[in-house]
From Swiss-Prot:
Residues 459-470, 667-678 have a biased composition (Basic and acidic residues). GO terms for cellular component: host cell nucleus; virion component. This is Portal protein. Forms a portal in the viral capsid through which viral DNA is translocated during DNA packaging. Assembles as a dodecamer at a single fivefold axe of the T=16 icosahedric capsid. Binds to the molecular motor that translocates the viral DNA, termed terminase. Residues 376-405, 459-480, 622-678 are annotated as: Disordered. Keywords: Disulfide bond, Host nucleus, Viral genome packaging, Viral release from host cell, Virion. The gene is UL6. Residues 422-443 are annotated as: Putative leucine zipper motif.
Amino acid sequence: MAAQRARAPAMRTRGGDAALCAPEDGWVKVHPTPGTMLFREILLGQMGYTEGQGVYNVVRSSEAATRQLQAAIFHALLNATTYRDLEEDWRRHVVARGLQPQRLVRRYRNAREGDIAGVAERVFDTWRCTLRTTLLDFAHGVVDCFAPGGPSGPTSFPKYIDWLTCLGLVPILRKTREGEATQRLGAFLRQHTLPRQLATVAGAAERAGPGLLDLAVAFDSTRMAEYDRVHIYYNHRRGEWLVRDPVSGQRGECLVLCPPLWTGDRLVFDSPVQRLCPEIVACHALREHAHICRLRNTASVKVLLGRKSDSERGVAGAARVVNKALGEDDETKAGSAASRLVRLIINMKGMRHVGDINDTVRAYLDEAGGHLIDTPAVDHTLPGFGKGGTGRGSRPQDPGARPQQLRQAFQTAVVNNINGMLEGYINNLFGTIERLRETNAGLATQLQARDRELRRAQAGALEREQRAADRAAGGGAGRPAEADLLRADYDIIDVSKSMDDDTYVANSFQHQYIPAYGQDLERLSRLWEHELVRCFKILRHRNKQGQETSISYSSGAIASFVAPYFEYVLRAPRAGALITGSDVILGEEELWEAVFKKTRLQTYLTDVAALFVADVQHAALPRPPSPTPADFRASASPRGGSRSRTRTRSRSPGRTPRGAPDQGWGVERRDGRPHARR
C-alpha cells in the first residue's frame, strides 16, 4: 500500500506565514491518505488479529526507554558526588555514633586485632548500605518527575514506535516551555529534606540539577503528533518534509528513520506494516469470502446411499441376521425354543409351493419333537391313551413302539391343521394381491404424470426467478460468470435412476461450501512474528529445556530505536551511556546496583573504607615505651635536629600524642576539625 498523490492546499500558520506549500512546487500530501489510515487500522486489529501479532505488544512497550531514562538519571546523580562531600558525611556519622578508631580500640581492647578490623568493616558496610538506599530513594523521586501523562503522554515511547511501524517516520511538534515535568522536578529538588541532611546528596543535586532540568525541559517542549490529526507533506525535488497540525496550525519537523521510496506518483514507505499490508489484505478478503459463503451458499445437496451386498440380501440374509441375533449361527448352535420357532417362520416365508408346508413342518417337529412330547413327562397309562392301561386281561405292548406312534400321530395332526389354515389364508391373499395389483398400476400411472408436471413447474419457476435476479443485478449479459454461479446454487440432483429395489437412502444433508483459510492465517501469523522480531531486533529468552520464557529488546534494538528516541525526538542533553539488552529485564533496584558499581561513588566508598580500617588497625597496635632523658642525650645532635626528628617519628600517623585528648578521626586541623586521612 502506498500513499497516493493528493493536492496540498496553501496553508498559513497562526503567525501569518506565507504560503506553506503549493502543488506547483512539488509538494505531495503523504498523510493522511486511505493507505496510511489503513496501516493504523491494521495495527489496531481491524483487519484481524493473529498470534504472531502479539509480539508487537513487546515492541511498543516503554520498558526499554524507561530503563534508559533511569540509568541516565542514576549516572548523573552518582557521578555528581565528590570525595569531599562523602568524607564529610562519613566524619559526621563517626562523631555522632562515637566510632572513632581510638574509641573502637578502647571499647574492644580485649579482642584480637582481626576481630577489631572486622568490626570496623561491618560498621562501614552498614553506613555504606544506608547511604546507597538513601540515594536510591532520592533518585526514584527524580525519575517520577519525568513521567507526566503516562503511556499516552505526548512524548510516550509507544506512540513513537507506532509511527515507525506504520510509516517509518515520526512527526514532531516542538515548543520550548517549562511544563509539568520541569515544575515537578524543580519543586522536588527545592523541597526535599535530604539535601539539607547529607552533603553528598546536596552536592549531587547541585551539580546534576541543571542537566536534569534541561532534560525535563526537553520532555516538556516535545510533542509527537497524533496519527489522525496531523498532515505530512513531502517535496521530492527538495527532499524536504513538512508537518502541520490542522487544528492549531503549528508547524513541526519530521524524523525519518527509514527513508521511503518515491516512485513518481506515490510514496512507498519502508515500514513493517507496508511490507505486510498486501498479505493482510489478501487474507482478510479470503475470510470475508468465506463468511459470505457461509451466509448464502447452499450448494451442493449430497445424498448418501447404502446398498447391501448380494450375499446379505433376500431371505437368506434375513435368516442369517436372525440367527446371529438369537445366537443360532453356525458357531453357537444354541437350542432355544425361540430360535427354532423363528426359523420355522422364516422357512415358511421362503416356501415356493404349498406342498412345501409338509416338509417344513415335519422338519420343525423332528427338531423339536423330543421337546414337545417328552416321554417321561407323559403318563401313557392314563385314560385317553387307548389301550395303554394296565388292567387285568391287558396284554403288555412294546415300550418303544407306543411313543413312536404318538409322535407320528401328533405330526400328522399338526400338518393337517396347518395345511387347512394356510390354504384358506393363501386363497384370501391371492385375491387381495390381484385387487392391489390393479389399484397399484393405476396409482403408478397417476404418480408419474404428477411427477412430470412438478418437474416442469419447478424448472419454469427457477428460470423465472433467475431472470428476475439477473435483471435486478443490472442485466443478465453483464456478469455471466456470476449468473452461472447462481444457477449452480439451485441445481437439483436426481438419484432415483440409480436406485433399485435393494437400494435405499441412508442419509441426505445440505453441505455449505466454505473456503478454508486456516493455513493462510498461520502463514500470516508467522510473517508478523518474523517481521517484528527481525525488524526491531527482539531478543528471545529461553530456559534450559528450550522453551521461550520472555522476549525483550536486544542491545542492537536499543542502539537502533531507543537511542534515536532520546537523541533526535527528545533532544535530551544528557542521555548517558546506552544500557544493554540484559539491563532491560532488570528491576529498578537491580539496575541501580548495576549502575552504582560503575560510578565514581563506588570508588570513593572503597577508599574511605580502606582508610578507616587501617586507622583502626593502627590504633590497636601496642604503644612503644616513653623515651628516657638518656635516650635523648645519646641520640641528640649538636644542632638539635635529631631530637626533633626522633620525637616526630615516635608518633604513628593518625594518632594523637600520649595524653592528648581524642579529637576525632585523623589529625586535628587549625580550625579544631580533624583532618581526614587519605
